Design a protein with these regions (language model features):
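Noncatalytic scaffold domains of N-terminal-nucleophile
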Residues: 1-24, 29-199, 203-205, 209-244, ...
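Internal maturation/activation junctions in enzymes
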Residues: 263-335, 346-347, 452, 458
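Amphipathic alpha-helical
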Residues: 204-230, 288-309, 326, 339-343
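Extended C-terminal regions of large enzymes
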Residues: 250-254, 259, 383-401, 413
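Short, small/polar residue-rich loop motifs at catalytic or cofactor-binding pockets
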Residues: 235, 314-317, 376-378
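Extended C-terminal subregions enriched in glycine
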Residues: 291, 295-298, 326, 372, ...
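Active-site rim segments in enzyme catalytic domains, especially the processed small/beta chain
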Residues: 42-49, 53-68, 222-224, 328-392, ...
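Short beta-strand scaffold segments in enzyme catalytic cores
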Residues: 48-49, 53-60, 318-323, 331, ...
C-alpha cells in the first residue's frame, strides 16, 4: 500500500488545488485530471485552452497503461481560394528571438475538449458537473497573476493585443498584466456550462464550431464545421523501452518525443553513460521524421504505430501528473503553440497556431497534408520496475528539449535513486546554438570541442520536469520543477 492517498505535481498552484479538491471529494486520478486540465484554461492561458491539444499517459490499475492522443489535426481542405489571414510575429525569449505566424490560417482543429470527454467516458468515476464545480468556482473569482504567468503573457503580448475582444482581459490601462494583477476570463464559467449541459458536442457541433467556420470563411482561415464534426481523439498503445533494469513507458506516434527519448537512452548506454556525447551523437544523426521512425523501428521492432505525419516540434507546453490512492495515475502534457491571436467570441478561449509553426509544417506554410494529425515533442513519461510496479511519473515543457531533460531526470531519480527533490535540482546539460549549455555544478563531461555556456541561475531553458516518484518502500515523493515555478502536493489520511 502507498503511504499516501494522492500525489500531484503541476505547473501552477491553482491547477494543483483544483486536482486536489477532486481527490479529496473521492474522485480518482482521471476525474482530477479533467478538472485540472480545464482549470489550466485560466491558470495557464498561454499553454492551454479549448483551442489546444495534447497527450496523456493513463495508467489504470485494472486496464494497464495507454496513451490518449488529443492533439491537433490539419484541416480537411488545404484549398487556397482565399487570401489567408496569416501574419508573422517575432517573440523574444531572452537568449533568442523566433518568428512565428498567427492568424486564422494558422489554426488547426483542436482536441482538448474531445480528449477530456474521451477520458471521462472511459475512466471517470464522478458526475461531470461535480468534476467541473471547483473549476467554475475559480472561473467566477479569477486569480492573481503569478511570476511564470507574467513572464509568459509578457512574451506573447503582441498576440494578445491582436484580438481587441480580449484587450480588457489581458491588459490593464493599456499595460499587459503583470505579477500580482487580478486575472479573470469573464465568459469562462458560461463556457463550462456549455460543456456541462451539451457535452463534447457543445463545442464541436454548436456555437464555437459555427463561429469559427464563419470567421474563417469571411476572413481567411481553413477550418470549417466539418473539421470539428470529424475530429476524434484516440487511444493508442504505448511504447515500452528497457533502460538499466527498468521499463520506460513512452508515448507512441504522433509523439516523436517518445521515439527521440528511446533512442537517446540507448545512445547514452552505448556512449559510456556520457550525456554530452549521447546528445551530440544523437543530434548529429539529424533525423527527419521518416528516418527517426525507421531508426526506432530497427532498434525496437514491432512497437511503432503507423502515422502519416511528418513534423516534430512544439513550444508553449505545460504538464501535470496525478496519482490517486487506488494506484491510478496520469501524466498529461498540452500546448496551444503561441496561440493564433483569435479568441472564440463569448468563450475567452484562444485557438492554437499549429499551422503557423515552421517546424510543424516542414513542407512549407499552407502545404501541409489535409486531415492529418500533427506530431509533437511532448513526452509524458512513466517508469515501471521489473515487477511491473509503477515507480515514476513525469513530463515537461520545453519544446524540442523535452525528451533530453526527462531522460536526465529519470537517470538521476530512478537509476541513481536520488531523492526527488535532489534529482530535480541536479544540474542538466544540452547542446544548442553550437555550444555546450550546462547548469552550474554539472559534474559530467562538458568537453566535445564546442564553446561553453554556463547557466548560473535556474532557467526554463532546461525544461520543467514535474514528477512523482514511488519508492521501493511505497513512500511517495512529488516535486514541481522550480525552473518553471512548478507546484506539488501529497495527501495523507
Amino acid at each position: 500500500m502507498l503511504n499516501c492517498i494522492y500525489a500531484i505535481s503541476a505547473g501552477h498552484e491553482k491547477t494543483l488545488e483544483i486536482a486536489e479538491s477532486i481527490l479529496k471529494e473521492g474522485g480518482n486520478a482521471f476525474d482530477a485530471a479533467i478538472a485540472a486540465h480545464l482549470a489550466m484554461y485560466l491558470t495557464e492561458p498561454c499553454m492551454a485552452s479549448a483551442g489546444a491539444g495534447g497527450f496523456a499517459l493513463c495508467h489504470h490499475v485494472e486496464h494497464g497503461t495507454m496513451m490518449l492522443d488529443f492533439f491537433t489535426q490539419t484541416p480537411l481542405s488545404s484549398r487556397m481560394d482565399f487570401d489567408p489571414d496569416f501574419r508573422s510575429i517575432l517573440v523574444n525569449f531572452g537568449n533568442e528571438s523566433e518568428e512565428f505566424h498567427i492568424g486564422l490560417a494558422s489554426m488547426a482543429t483542436p482536441g482538448s475538449v474531445d480528449g477530456m470527454f474521451k477520458l471521462y467516458e472511459r475512466f471517470a468515476s464522478m458526475p461531470f458537473e461535480d468534476i467541473i464545480a471547483p473549476v467554475q468556482d475559480l472561473a467566477r473569482i479569477g486569480l492573481a497573476i503569478n511570476k511564470f504567468q507574467s513572464i509568459d503573457i509578457g512574451l506573447l503580448e503582441d498576440i494578445f493585443a491582436s484580438d481587441p475582444s480580449v484587450n480588457d482581459i489581458f491588459f490593464n490601462s493599456g499595460q499587459i498584466l503583470r505579477e500580482g494583477d487580478h486575472f479573470i476570463l469573464p465568459h469562462f464559467s458560461d463556457f463550462l456550462d456549455l460543456l456541462r449541459y451539451e457535452g463534447r458536442d457543445g463545442f464541436y457541433l454548436d456555437y464555437p464550431a459555427r463561429q469559427i467556420e464563419k470567421v474563417c470563411k469571411e476572413n481567411g482561415g481553413f477550418l470549417s464545421r466539418k473539421d470539428f464534426e470529424s475530429y476524434t481523439s484516440r487511444w493508442v498503445k504505448v511504447l515500452e523501452i528497457p533502460f538499466k533494469g527498468f521499463n520506460v513507458i513512452l508515448p507512441n506516434l504522433p509523439c516523436v518525443g517518445g521515439l527521440t527519448m528511446a533512442l537517446l537512452l540507448k545512445t547514452y548506454q552505448e556512449k559510456g553513460e556520457d550525456w554530452l556525447r549521447a546528445i551530440y551523437d544523437f543530434k548529429a544523426c539529424n533525423y527527419n521524421f521518416t528516418q527517426l521512425a525507421q531508426a526506432f523501428s530497427h532498434t525496437f521492432p514491432g512497437q511503432l504505430k503507423p502515422t502519416d505525419s511528418d513534423s516534430n516540434f512544439n513550444r508553449g507546453t505545460s504538464h501535470f501528473n496525478i496519482m490517486d490512492k487506488y494506484g491510478n495515475a496520469i501524466a498529461l502534457t498540452c500546448t496551444l503553440g503561441e496561440g493564433s491571436g483569435y479568441f472564440i467570441p463569448g468563450t475567452d478561449m484562444q485557438m492554437n497556431n499549429m499551422l503557423g509553426e515552421a517546424f510543424l509544417v516542414p513542407q512549407g506554410f499552407h502545404k501541409w497534408t489535409p486531415d492529418t494529425r500533427l506530431n509533437s515533442m511532448m513526452t509524458p513519461t512513466m517508469v515501471k520496475d521489473k515487477n511491473r510496479r509503477l515507480r515514476f511519473i513525469c513530463g515537461s515543457g520545453g519544446a524540442g528539449r523535452i525528451p533530453y531533460m526527462i531522460s536526465q531526470m529519470i537517470h538521476s531519480s530512478v537509476i541513481r535513486d536520488m531523492k526527488l527533490e535532489d534529482a530535480m535540482m541536479d544540474p542538466r546539460i544540452y547542446l544548442y546554438a553550437n555550444a555546450v549549455q550546462y547548469e552550474t555544478g554539472y559534474k559530467g563531461n562538458i568537453e566535445i570541442g564546442l564553446a561553453h555556456k554556463e547557466w548560473k541561475d535556474l532557467s526554463l531553458f532546461f525544461g520543467g520536469v514535474h514528477a512523482i516518484k514511488i519508492n521501493e518502500d511505497n513512500s511517495v515523493e512529488a516535486e514541481g520543477d522550480p525552473r518553471r515555478f512548478g507546484a506539488a502536493s501529497i495527501g495523507y489520511e
